[in-house]
């Protein structure tokens, strides 16, 4: 039906007869001439109808936005004065000789001239995806997956599919359950990741595996989360953590070079402890130049409990954040930042405004200066390298609250004051995470997952001091987003059972949930390691959007609903009966 795409026509096509198929993007009726912008997935081209082709001109008068049409015509060069430098096809136009209206369009529920609500865009997603910016994002996504496949094939990886209907295993979020009609009362689970299957593939001898795969997690959603999402899943045998990172870094550098024309360079490597200490985050945005500075040792003896308490508490921390030029902040802005850190558990926000350092106490403005002597203030200013015009904010509490609150404040202030260089790309690896973290109920939970190997520890050493264990794990972070994470896996049965025990999984439960894995570990398991990238998040970064729904063709809302198909929906009672399922309403509390 077509010979060319609208958006691919150039001066090299001048004089050629072409047939185009697409949609009316815009129509301008000048009486004796009618112009339309015609659009397909590759872009837009201007088509015009003149009186010499009367039948086509007459039919063109009926055109309206989003009519699906076919046009045959001749490509012509535009006059110099009519060239549109904002269009890729702006140097040419098509003189139409024939027009076919393939399908007409009703009045549109989306307005191309105004910003539509996200609810409307998701309800009429098939119309929203016609917009050039949305089409471009999905084309970029397709390019990314193509580049990934070629890279992985070239590096000896095998694309192997793993099951979608599997067994529920604890991986940190709730599973989506699928009832079995054949096995009454039993359920499959949709995979949160192919984690155990890819490890089993390594035990099967496949050495290098990858898969671009759908995963499912029934968890509370955020702006950058979806209940179903896509991973670039990777696993290797006989490779160390640095070797895995080297190959995966090469993949991401390849993507950025091919898609953005940007060489990311070598990725710096930072430990979890350093990232938390300097940036208050395990996924630091290195485009922001500000860092946290520990000042607890300077404040242990002050008669100000807000500072002295955490300064003398082994689990406490007092950190300072120097904001270049921050002395210009108003009291209202400072109060807003004080309220902001309370979201993260902080009780408030102390500060020192540095007006003129040379004037000593008279050169600063601070509500806490009365609790600190000149010597301590000068020591703080020295340590933070404060200059005239700077602001110093303080966080004082337990280590987690200080890291969370001051890390978030660092990002917010950096964005608000234009200190974060948003023209840059700042990738890094974060390594050496704690293996376990407090579950809030007196126990431990795996920071990554229970199949991650500890670093330089025997099973006996791990059992004796799990709180000291460092995971042989690594996350890739770009511009403050965790785009991928992985680890060296446990390949020894005793170590795996030790980890399960630390996590409170008794031997009976281990056999019930992971018997197949524990059995497989008995038969010459190779050392193996891997990683998974979030394809949606990678595409988000490479297309310049901050909304993950912009890079998924048919996404869910933050309530895990599809507004277009109205999923989820109530099931047919007959289907439920076949599955031996009965929906029971919860009793309402009076």
Curated annotation (Swiss-Prot):
SUPFAM superfamilies: Class II aaRS and biotin synthetases, GAD domain-like, Nucleic acid-binding proteins. PROSITE patterns: AA_TRNA_LIGASE_II. Keywords: Aminoacyl-tRNA synthetase, ATP-binding, Cytoplasm, Ligase, Nucleotide-binding, Protein biosynthesis. ATP binds at residues 217-219, 226, 482, 534-537. One of its GO terms (biological process) is aspartyl-tRNA aminoacylation. Its EC number is 6.1.1.12. Its main location: cytoplasm. It is found in: Cytoplasm. It is an enzyme of class 6 (ligase). L-aspartate binds at residues 171, 217, 448, 489. InterPro entries: Aa-tRNA-synt_II, aa-tRNA-synth_II, aa-tRNA-synth_II/BPL/LPL, Asp-tRNA-ligase_1, Asp-tRNA-ligase_1_N, Asp/Asn-tRNA-synth_IIb, AspRS_core, GAD-like_sf. Residues 195-198 are annotated as: Aspartate. GO terms for molecular function: aspartate-tRNA ligase activity; ATP binding; nucleic acid binding. It catalyses: tRNA(Asp) + L-aspartate + ATP = L-aspartyl-tRNA(Asp) + AMP + diphosphate. Belongs to the class-II aminoacyl-tRNA synthetase family. Type 1 subfamily. Catalyzes the attachment of L-aspartate to tRNA(Asp) in a two-step reaction: L-aspartate is first activated by ATP to form Asp-AMP and then transferred to the acceptor end of tRNA(Asp). Homodimer. This is Aspartate--tRNA ligase.
